[in-house]
Amino acid sequence: MADFEVLGQTVGTNRFFVIGGPCVIENRDMTLRIAEFLRNACARLHIPCVFKSSYDKANRTSIHSYRGPGIEEGLAILSEVRREIGIPVLTDVHGVSEVAPAKEVVDILQVPAFLARQTDLVVAVGLTGKPVNLKKAQFLAPRDMSLVIEKVRGTGNDKILVTERGTQFGYNNLVVDMRSIPILSESGCPVVFDATHSVQLPGGQGTRSGGERRYVAALACAAVAAGAHGVFLEMHEDPDRALCDGPNSLPLEQVSPLLEKLLDIHRIVRDTYGAQDADIERKTGREH
């Protein structure tokens, strides 16, 4: 599997890593505070981390919902996070025209789940040569993502993360099939589990989406046990007052205890199954 380096941190399959931050940029000061919190929490545990936030949420449920500061102001804030806090940044792009300005600022470009089938966008992101995070669409089977990954690889870009974020289950609900973790791993890409969007209740509160925050930890633990290489966690200083995705975002005080637990699970999985894989390679003569 392809590991890659972003701003001095290795993201891939060898070390557990975290992508985290508020769903959307609400203001500069809060964004910097949460980025600093994430950096410090991960540094204490020696976990590579990437800060994520959006300058625009183009798929909000209601026309009246807050979307973000916009691309110009948002990228300026993300640039400040990268420069002042010193951690790599990730943001999502919603159209081909956004790719060029975003690539000048961020370390990883993300294709949103709803846009995973938009070939022009996927190819444009791949052509930047930047690392790409492909989020599995809620309406796609895990194996279908191999075709999305192929579009990026076709540009010559092999720095790809693929993220599981749940599957539509009837109306206003998502469910996670943990088989998707090993299935997505067959692609050769590091697999991320989006533990917070996976508990979202899309459109579940009428004019906005709901969420079941209490299940974030359980699903994150299950995903890492199933072989996820990293987790994606949205977090906020006051989730109940967040302007986007509050019901499924973690309060900051819950982040470090969860990361400690996930790191322990990851070590067990790595030490147990990594040793088994090496033993199989030795017995079959495939070890070099």
Curated annotation (Swiss-Prot):
<comment type="pathway">
    <text>Bacterial outer membrane biogenesis; lipopolysaccharide biosynthesis.</text>
</comment>
<dbReference type="GO" id="GO:0008676">
    <property type="term" value="F:3-deoxy-8-phosphooctulonate synthase activity"/>
</dbReference>
<dbReference type="GO" id="GO:0019294">
    <property type="term" value="P:keto-3-deoxy-D-manno-octulosonic acid biosynthetic process"/>
</dbReference>
<dbReference type="InterPro" id="IPR006269">
    <property type="entry name" value="KDO8P_synthase"/>
</dbReference>
<keyword id="KW-0963">Cytoplasm</keyword>
<keyword id="KW-0448">Lipopolysaccharide biosynthesis</keyword>
<dbReference type="GO" id="GO:0005737">
    <property type="term" value="C:cytoplasm"/>
</dbReference>
<keyword id="KW-0808">Transferase</keyword>
<protein>
    <recommendedName>
        <fullName>2-dehydro-3-deoxyphosphooctonate aldolase</fullName>
        <ecNumber>2.5.1.55</ecNumber>
    </recommendedName>
</protein>
<dbReference type="InterPro" id="IPR006218">
    <property type="entry name" value="DAHP1/KDSA"/>
</dbReference>
<comment type="similarity">
    <text>Belongs to the KdsA family.</text>
</comment>
<comment type="pathway">
    <text>Carbohydrate biosynthesis; 3-deoxy-D-manno-octulosonate biosynthesis; 3-deoxy-D-manno-octulosonate from D-ribulose 5-phosphate: step 2/3.</text>
</comment>
<dbReference type="Pfam" id="PF00793">
    <property type="entry name" value="DAHP_synth_1"/>
</dbReference>
<dbReference type="InterPro" id="IPR013785">
    <property type="entry name" value="Aldolase_TIM"/>
</dbReference>
